[in-house]
Amino acid sequence: MSNPRQLALQIQINERASLNNFFVSKKNNKTIQILKNILLGSDKGAQIFIDDLGSNGKSYLLQAICNDFSNSNNSSIYIPMQEAINLDPSILEGVSELNLICIDDIDLINKRREWEIALFNLINECYEKECFLLLSGSINKLEAIPDLVSRIKKMEILRLEAINDDELLEATKAISKNLNIEISDKNMNYLINNSKRDIKTIFRTLSQLEKESLERKKSIGLNLIKEVIQNS
């Protein structure tokens, strides 16, 4: 459940997100295991940057980690910069008192000096207070003040790789199961072959299918899949 600090931001978090529901491709096994160790408390005060060059699921992953961490009676917050960038950087003040801070898409703060300084100060505070700090974005797109770039590059950098094409069907089935929706293999293959082949798009399409199916009180057939893909 979201903590009061999360609610105060008026930024929603997907409360169904969990590492138990995150499809782990073979190339991401090491990354996910390191992140799970954080949840187990075996690496107190870790500072990690998740480098994601595409739509490989980093936003869901950060929300899943926040939820799982909070469910273990720890405090956490998820801050997506796509929404927070329009807020005052002062929202970062005091968050180092929490056990875990996840900030998504930090490369969006490029050329915004007040945000760059606020994030630099937060990194220092988290180091002193040994709170967990997870940042995500594209390390190659980061163009900020030198001190901030230097600090981030000293973090443990984990790469979130794209799912292989031969894993897409398995991933789609796993997501469908977690959403409690039923789609035939034939229709699932149609969905994959007619969508952008990344896990973010697949998840968004399946989530919309779940919503439409519930609202219309009908099963998910080919016509509904075509409609959702066309409107996405």
Feature map (PLM): residue ranges:
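Conserved AAA+ ATPase "SRH/arginine-finger" region at the nucleotide-binding site
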Residues: I139-N140, M155-E167
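The conserved phosphate-sensing helix
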Residues: S195-L209
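Short glycine-rich substrate-engagement loop in P-loop NTPases that contacts/grips substrate
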Residues: C66-L100, N110-R113
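A short, basic N-terminal segment
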Residues: M1-N37, L214-S232
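Short regulatory helix/loop adjacent to the ATP-binding pocket of P-loop NTPases
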Residues: N140-K154
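Walker A/P-loop nucleotide-binding motif
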Residues: D43-L62
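Short conserved motifs of the RecA-like P-loop NTPase core
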Residues: E182-N194
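Conserved P-loop NTPase "ATPase switch" module shared by AAA+ and STAND
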Residues: G94-E116, L122, K129-S138
